[in-house]
Amino acid sequence: VHGDIYKNEPLAFLIEDSQIKEQIEPYFMARIVDVKEFLQHFPFVGTADAFHFIIEDPVAPWNNGIFALTWDEQGQVRVLNEPIGKPVRLNIQTLTCLMMNYRRASYLARIERLETDEETLKSLERIIPNMEAYFSDYF
């Protein structure tokens, strides 16, 4: 039997004889074209103490720099271009992986693709929805 499934599908666990061959091949690519606009519309879960991303993007210079996130009394995020709160240093590729939940903040920090303090790392884990990124192009 040959088939395609998405990342983290527990197929091997569900089959009684779980000796199967699994092969992971990247299929879709994602890119955040406008960091500020993306962050302003992102569905954060709750709020956090203010922090700021320090982004490097070699292709889109408007994405380079500081993007601070603060939340108002109604829980609406505001994105400002000034260093408010603790820093989170990463490149655009890592930011995309993080925000699309391809990889969690703690993993990205562990492999040194994201730099921040422990408290801000916990905030990122909490406010970024923990859902599978899934794009189906079969329709």
Regions found by a protein language model. Give the residues of each.
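Intrinsically disordered, low-complexity, positively biased terminal segments
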Residues: 1-139
